[in-house]
Amino acid sequence: GDVYKRQVSNKNYGVLWDSYSLCRFGDPRDYSQLGDVFKLYDKEGKEGALTGTYIPGKKDVETLVRREDSLYFEHLDRAAHLSKVVNLPAEFPFGGSDVVYEGEIEPAESGLFRFILYYAGYMKVYIDNELVVPERWRTAWNPNSYKFAVNLEAGKRVPLKIEWKPDAGISYCGLRALSPVADEEQNKLSWWGEMQNEIDYYFVYGDDMDDVISGYRTLTGKSQIMPKWAMGYWQSREKYNTREEVLSTLKEFRERQIPIDNIVIDWLHWEQDSWGSHEFDPERFPDPKGMVDSIHAMNGRLMISVWPKFYATTDHFKEFDEKGWMYQQAIRDSIKDWVGPGYLGSFYDAYDADARKLFWKQMQDHYYPLGIDAWWMDASEPNIRDCTDLQYRKDLCGPTALGPSAKFFNAYALMNAEAIYDGQRGVEPDKRVFLLTRSGFAGLQRYSTATWSGDIATRWEDMKAQISAGLNFAVSGIPYWTMDIGGFCVENRYVAGQMEFNKTGRENADYKEWRELNTRWYQFGAFCPLFRAHGQYPYREVWNIAPAGHPCYNSIVYYTKLRYNMMPYIYSLAGMTYFNDYTIMRPLVMDFTADANVNNIGDQFMFGSALMVAPVYEYGARSREVYFPASCGWYDFYSGKYVDGGQKLTVDAPYERIPLYVCEGAIVPYGPDMQYSDEKPASEITLYVYTGKDGAFTLYEDEGVNYNYEKGQYATIPFAYNDAEGTLVIGDRTGDFPGMLKERTFNVVKVSKDQPQPFDLKAKGTTVKYA
């Protein structure tokens, strides 16, 4: 489902559309079936439909050919238990098959036609004999959509061809279209909400885009400072199946001296038939309190997956149900899930304030006494049944305590997050909350909640899409975003490559690509607000991806260590998100608004005010184009060499390095090597000053784990560089907090055009004793 809609302009204004229902913006029309937009012709030239050819993967099954007057195979049949897709030939075995839809389309008008492709498995689209959608893939149970546009002429018939490899017995396919809009409408923005009492929106104006986002947070709530350990590395997978797997993984990180703060236990840590019991399976996870204590003894933190879902046989379901706080449609329709034989259950109504209190109480009674540190709120759309048509989705998650589900369709994640945030702060007011949720809504930041981008695929195009996705999420006003590094859903070829390597020790072509994909994704992930790896098999621990000494291993470890060196910088940015309404992951347009060349750049970004990151997202690429915004010069992070701004260059991108540049005037504090975020006090800081322009930065520090910063218990140290004089002023400390360092040393390293200096914690600089 769509999240709330917020539009931000580089003209320094934003619009917040205040609606909880399903919304659209831009062109508010819904996509239509192909036959409603075009005349269709099959491959024989007969009007009224395309030709669908279903070529089985089994020799004893005949090829099926039929006319298709629409391509709308996007949903499970409501009456079938995960076994039939609406409109597809039920008798055809899709596993291993090839499907081709072909013919011609004829528009009644000329202009830009927009299409939305719905796909699972492998898919390509050709229009007018040109490949308009290169191969895309998504695992069959988790379809995706992709939008594209093509110019067509009125009355001109053009060939259309879709090649589809379903990749499983149940799979999905769809292609719908929008007719052109008039030229004068192209640049107009429209908003549409399915159900609301009135048209309601906020117009927010500011001096710059940061000021606009500050206005949004004035309306919807401050962004809390996450626990400091949340800024460290997160190791996850689907899934650690035993207590031993969890503890041995964390132990391996420590023995290899690879920094880590957080490890994650995913779904199904309970007994198979006990979803929602909040009890660990005693056979696989004996003594869960002892397990958590062992994690803490290794200076780690634990996040656990908690769904708003309950099997009907659990006591927790019954407790909700007897109070009328459980959605009933799935129970009435006997909807069973995908686990084992399939179990009956549903989700609780998070729109009821008392139901939210009960949801937390059940967690408090079972999980919280174990010492669990963070909460992973999965499926918070809520996703009661996969691949379900929109109307039935609304039926399944309503009615709510506040009214029809259609009216409150998109706010469930916000309500669910409120349950945990208010619940934990009610029990331990000073312990920082951390939540991770799959969906979001306006105001989520006030509940110390981060959002990740869901079950994305292990594809290069999916990795590229994450760059712009993260940036768009950031300018929506919610600063903490993350993704499944490496992608969640894995192509079978990568699984086969891993298994062949396990058996023979040979790195085949697919496994070689798998390693490079993960390398590039980790490089990118190290510069996101949260640094988190997760996904299905193959396992995502660095030593399971590649052995020590391999370029993949070396690179992942390098950037993990660099992340911890950057902790003084990153945590200062976190402080700014609260006190200054700052945004950590920044599209270039936020900092270089006067440079029109940055307006449409979605594959580079600023990490804070200093670092420009240019991820590599093409297999085998050892260089990429980078645009260097005007108004300042740039320094190569690794060599210190200077580059003039206002130009596009092809830069080196060797396997082990991501292109990374620092702008003139930047002041960046780096801390010592660490194995976890609070291993050492930052008593020695290497302070890099990139000369050429005046610059400033403020170091922010607090206790890192509590809410004393809300009471004024924190400290800041300002740095100001005057380029004309070549002087750096380290200002007086402001503020105080328990445990604060009273004395420290700064090693000030200047980088200039004439004296390039690579990043090196041992670089010779000017030592400043500070007290």
How would you describe each model-predicted region?
Residues 110, 155-157, 743:
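Extracellular Ig-like/FN3 beta-sandwich strand-entry sites
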Residues 101, 611-615, 726-734:
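Short, well-ordered beta-strand segments enriched in hydrophobic/aromatic residues
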